[in-house]
Every structure is written in C-alpha cells, then in structure tokens.
Regions:
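Short, local alpha-helical segments
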Residues: 60-65, 71-77
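Alpha-solenoid HEAT/Armadillo repeat architecture
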Residues: 13-14, 29-33, 48, 67-68, ...
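Amphipathic alpha-helical scaffolding segments comprising HEAT/armadillo-like alpha-solenoid repeats
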Residues: 17-30, 53-65, 87-98, 119-122
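Structural detector for internal amphipathic alpha-helices that build alpha-solenoid repeat scaffolds
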Residues: 3-17, 40-53, 73-85, 107-116
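Short inter-helical turns and helix N-cap capping residues of alpha-solenoid HEAT/ARM repeat scaffolds
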Residues: 2, 35-36, 70-71, 101-106
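Short, intrinsically disordered, low-complexity segments enriched in Ser/Thr and Pro
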Residues: 97, 101-122
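Short charge-dense sequence patches
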Residues: 8-13, 26-45, 59-64
Length: 122
C-alpha cells in the first residue's frame, strides 16, 4: 500500500478541496507531530512530491488545524518541513514567531533564519 500511496500522491491536487485538504492535514500531522522517524520522513517525502506552489497555499490554510505551532517541538518540525517544501513557506513559517511570547518559538525562528543566511552565503 505504501508504494501505491507515494506513487499516486501527485493525484491529490486533482481531488476535491475537501478530500485534498484532509490528505494534506494528515500528512502535516505526521510530518510534524510524531516521534517515530519513519512517519515523519515518509510524510515529508510525500509532501515534497507535490507542486510547491499549490502545497504552500494548502499548508498556510491548514497548518493550524494539524500542527500545534505554539509548541516549540512541533514548530521546529514544521520549519524543517517548510525548508524542504520552499523558501516562501519557510519565510512564512519563520514570520509566525513574531506573534509568539514563547522564547523557544522565537529561538527556533532565529535558528532557521540563520540557516537561510548561511545557506545563501555558500
């Protein structure tokens, strides 16, 4: 079943909005929440196979339903995922920290911002 899902993941963009949203929410949850590395990496791999332009729009609309952005551990997992998807999504994810009173969230955003600068200097 795993091969069928990953080979057909690109078909999600052709599903109805309700169905595609449920699939993306589930993949977001598994990409950012669990501690089981296989679930994290498999979900990220599936998401990375989708059109980043389409996916960025979906994620921005759905992330708060699947990921506890106010938890620093889940927020870091979300930034890791965003880094894989696109610079636009990562920038948006980093900007979320502006509204946080949690110093660990702010620190995570700063860490990823520094990584962006470092990666562009290479």
């Amino acid at each position: 079943a795993g091969k069928e899902i990953s080979s057909d993941i690109q078909q999600v963009v052709h599903e109805t909005d309700d169905i595609s949203s449920e699939i993306i929410k589930a993949l977001l949850f598994y990409a950012c929440n669990p501690t089981h590395i296989a679930l994290i990496t498999y979900s990220r791999k599936c998401l990375s196979q989708l059109s980043s332009e389409w996916l960025c729009i979906k994620i921005k609309n759905l992330v708060f339903q699947s990921v506890n952005i106010y938890d620093d551990w889940e927020y870091r997992r979300f930034l890791e995922l965003s880094e894989i998807i696109s610079k636009e999504l990562l920038d948006w994810g980093i900007s979320i920290a502006i509204f946080s009173t949690n110093p660990e969230i702010v620190e995570a955003a700063e860490d990823f911002k520094k990584r962006q600068v470092y990666n562009t200097e290479l």
